Amino acid sequence: MPSIAKLPDIVANKISAGEVVQRPASVVKELLENSIDSGASAITVVIKEAGRQLVRIIDNGCGMDSDDALLSVERFATSKISDVDDLNALRTLGFRGEALASISSVSHFELKTRRQSEPVGIQLISNGGEIEGPQPAQCEPGTSISVRNLFFNVPARRKFLKSNATEFKHIHETVKAFVLAYPEIEWRLINDDHELFYFRTPDVRERLSHFYGEGFGESLIEVTEENDYMTIGGYLGKPGMMVRQKYDQYFYINRRLIQNRMLVQAVQQAYAELLEERQSPFALLFLGLDPSLVDVNVHPAKLEVKFEDEKSIRSMVYPVVKRAVRTADFSPEATVAPSPAPVGSHGIGLPESSSRKLAYSDFSGKSSTTGDLYRNYRQGAFDLSGASVPPPSIDPVESSFGSGSGEPYPSMVQESLLTPSADQPSAADEQNPVAPDKEPKIWQLHNKYIICQIKTGLMIIDQHVAHERVLYERAIDVMNEAVPNSQQLLFPQKIDLKPWQYEVYEEISEELYRLGFTIRPFGGLSVMIEGVPPDVRDGNEATILQDMIAEYQENASKLKLEKRDNLAKSYSCRNAIMTGQKLDVEQMRMLIDRLFATRMPYVCPHGRPVIIRLSLGELDRMFGRT
């Protein structure tokens, strides 16, 4: 008896499903491709419990008769190609004929379909690959496919699904990619019985503004280029619209969404110096190419493609994008500086009462890492040789970064670095006053690093991660306090969140409250920010919240972090002073004092170094003085 046997179809389909169906979003993608290929002009997506309970796709496409419906759930059965040469002329999104077979083998699957010319439709059911039907059924023209209890018979795969917020985020991103690529189709998305959008008009800019905020679509740079080899069209973001994640870059070949590193790099390099560190431009680009010049059959999910001549593609995309962003008007609109905030309001304004203090825990006595290096810094930077320098302590202070300098704030300086009020010197200053005519030996390098003379040489501090460490420890301590500390806004801010953002917000709302955010639902996907932690810069409340949610979600998908730890990391990263922000001597001095008052001043919350020391001995060796 031979030891090699052909696998039963039901087993083969489950194996195939491991490549084709990785998560609920994979089901959505495959079914939407079929709906588009059917010629549908209206598509509805219904989701329950992030696709675990239900994924339903309803379209008004051509529909199927009973024979085609039965064949559609068979492996390698398709109407889109008939021989190998057809792969070189693909105009459809699907072509392998394995999606429905794979999906139906790992779910409770129901298909209803009807041709326009037929008075009655048909229904077909599959429970884990066991087919029932087809049988007559009343239904609208087109096709409706319901996928329930995904992976019910593959518990290992179901176990490895992420949180509902993460899984729905992938679903929403998948649907959004199709919505932007097919404006001629009416799109409707319903999640847990709530309609998230219903697009009836073929206006891409309108759809972009829905997803990214009012006016977003109108402010984009439109790109149009064509030659005998390829067409390029789409939209690009201006520098003020840059994002820190690459979720918002969409590349299509013949309206098929793809992932391609070369295209990402070409766009990134075309923007060049217009980008700040870690920024990426928004891009929605459609490339039209002869199907014979691109192979889409190189990836199970059809996301990756192989170009016949990748260099030619890049040589067109790069100059087109570069020319578009170089010729666009990037000058910012003039804005009127806000008048000083009244006493007691959030942000920078008139001197506030010294009775308004932050409720952060006193760090004095907690730090065990400030010792010799802090003394070296104080003695070297302020010429306090021989003086007794105690570890820094942080008393309750006011959120008025630089308020004692007497100079206006630089436009990009983060006001959230806490400094003592004018009538409340720090403990270190009280015991070691610095003569007013003695300039501290502290400098800022390229608005990025702080350089200090210390008794034994030189100390270099990364200003962003230093402030990140300070904010992180404060956030952890505040969330562990009995009573949250929140600075109420004079004018509450309404924010419209994306569906996946709202899911994350609901997940972390309690921790946000303990951190100091006072937020209440405001109908639909909107929330109202009524209060924020005192560290948050005035006018930056909405941006900080949305950036925190994005950072939290990214951390959750990559790292296994406790919820409060994740939120504290997200808050500190997004709220810290950034590279490019100029600090004056007093601001740098206070940042250093706050850093050395933390429990772990040498590394940031993500493990990056904060401080580098260079001793006189090492410098002497470099110059051959030893």
Swiss-Prot record:
Keywords: DNA damage, DNA repair. Gene3D superfamilies: 3.30.230.10, Histidine kinase-like ATPase, C-terminal domain, MutL, C-terminal domain, dimerisation subdomain, MutL, C-terminal domain, regulatory subdomain. Residues 385-413, 418-437 are annotated as: Disordered. One of its GO terms (biological process) is mismatch repair. GO terms for cellular component: mismatch repair complex. CDD domains: HATPase_MutL-MLH-PMS-like (cd16926), MutL_Trans (cd00782). GO terms for molecular function: ATP binding; ATP hydrolysis activity; ATP-dependent DNA damage sensor activity; mismatched DNA binding. The keyword DNA repair applies. It comes from the Bacteria. This protein is involved in the repair of mismatches in DNA. It is required for dam-dependent methyl-directed DNA mismatch repair. May act as a 'molecular matchmaker', a protein that promotes the formation of a stable complex between two or more DNA-binding proteins in an ATP-dependent manner without itself being part of a final effector complex. PANTHER family: DNA MISMATCH REPAIR PROTEIN MLH, PMS, MUTL, DNA MISMATCH REPAIR PROTEIN MLH1. Belongs to the DNA mismatch repair MutL/HexB family. This is DNA mismatch repair protein MutL. The lineage of its organism: Bacteria, Pseudomonadati, Chlorobiota, Chlorobiia, Chlorobiales.
